[in-house]
């Protein structure tokens, strides 16, 4: 129905119409399904040319072709994603375990490799229903944010029979709107949930002294508490929403014989994939980056924004964040007054 030549002709006509410079654009492949079009460009500059400034070109192309959506990706990004997925599969397969959830995760990685251009979690889970483990195989660290919520949804869908736990140091780190998300999600998924009360006064005090960035200390403390919960309850896997530890680092054996599984990273997931799945669960989304404590630290000690920006850039380099998403997050720091 659609050819490379047709798409290139339409894109060039739109670029000329809106006054964009004429450029040579190279398309590697196109894929069409369910009134959605995937355009795979040879490289990122070709991708940028098709999207246009502010998404203007691809928006007009979608209107002109009467499509529900158009996805523009570079072939190099897919090569990188395919490589990471193969490493994830190899790492998970090397684990000497008969855990139901890990077996189902490997099947999902295989499916994503087979449908690398068009894999969609909604469609995948509507077409594939997995048996759930009789035993609780995973503890999911649930903060109420998008990444941890996505991780809990996946853990449930993949049959880990998870329990969700939330470390609660108070509203300066875990505000009430996040608790509302937690309640909504665990009820929707029918997942058992527990709060772990914690004293983070030292982390908060050090943060307000300007001596440390709070995220590292907070993450470390939370990890220890979730680890201890899993150990006390003899649950073999702890799941986090980390997007950076991809490939061979997606799952690691801890000193206490627990496995730490970074579920989004294991599937080389980007933010748009996460948002697409969690929008089915009526969760609130929040603009900006981080918790109220981080907001106050940025406000009181502007130099601390540098370390938050470094985190955003790491996620961008890994492909977890698109440059436009990263720019929005960084720009939000300028609204802190």
Whereabouts are the PLM-identified features?
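Short, surface-exposed ligand-recognition loops at beta-strand->loop->(often short) alpha-helix junctions
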Residues: 1-6, 45-48, 142
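A short amphipathic beta-strand at an alpha->beta junction
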Residues: 62-87
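Walker A (P-loop) phosphate-binding loop of P-loop NTPases
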Residues: 145
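Nucleotide-activated chemistry modules centered on ATP-dependent adenylation/adenylyltransferase
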Residues: 78-141, 149-337
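A short interface-forming secondary-structure element
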Residues: 33-56
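Charge-rich, low-aromatic oligomerization/scaffolding segments with amphipathic character
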Residues: 48-63, 90-94
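N-proximal, solvent-exposed amphipathic alpha-helical segments enriched in charged/polar residues
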Residues: 1-29
């Amino acid at each position: 129905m659609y050819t490379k030549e047709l798409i290139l002709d339409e894109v060039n006509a739109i670029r000329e119409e809106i006054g964009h410079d004429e450029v040579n654009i190279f398309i590697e492949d196109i894929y069409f399904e369910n009134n959605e079009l995937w355009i795979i460009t040879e490289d990122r500059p070709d991708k940028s040319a098709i999207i246009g400034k502010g998404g203007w070109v691809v928006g007009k192309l979608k209107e002109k072709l009467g499509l529900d959506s158009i996805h523009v990706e570079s072939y190099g990004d897919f090569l990188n994603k395919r490589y990471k997925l193969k490493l994830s599969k190899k790492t998970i397969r090397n684990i000497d375990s008969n855990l139901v959830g890990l077996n189902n995760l490997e099947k999902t990685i295989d499916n994503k490799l087979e449908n690398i251009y068009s894999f969609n979690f909604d469609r995948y889970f509507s077409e594939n229903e997995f048996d759930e483990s009789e035993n609780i195989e995973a503890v999911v660290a649930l903060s109420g944010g998008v990444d941890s919520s996505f991780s809990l949804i996946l853990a449930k869908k993949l049959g880990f029979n998870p329990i969700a736990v939330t470390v609660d140091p108070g509203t300066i780190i875990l505000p009430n709107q996040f608790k509302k998300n937690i309640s909504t999600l665990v009820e929707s998924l029918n997942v058992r949930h527990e709060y772990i009360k914690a004293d983070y006064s030292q982390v908060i005090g050090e943060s307000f002294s300007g001596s440390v960035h709070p995220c590292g200390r907070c993450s470390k403390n939370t990890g220890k508490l979730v680890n201890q919960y899993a150990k006390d309850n003899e649950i073999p896997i702890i799941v986090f929403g980390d997007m950076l530890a991809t490939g061979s680092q997606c799952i690691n054996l801890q000193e206490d014989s627990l496995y730490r599984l970074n579920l989004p990273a294991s599937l080389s997931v980007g933010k748009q994939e996460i948002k697409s799945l969690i929008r089915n669960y009526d969760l609130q989304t929040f603009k900006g980056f981080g918790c109220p404590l981080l907001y106050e630290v940025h406000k009181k000690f502007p130099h601390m924004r540098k370390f938050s920006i470094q985190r955003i850039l790491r996620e961008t380099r890994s492909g977890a964040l698109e440059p436009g998403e990263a720019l929005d997050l960084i720009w939000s720091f300028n609204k802190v007054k």
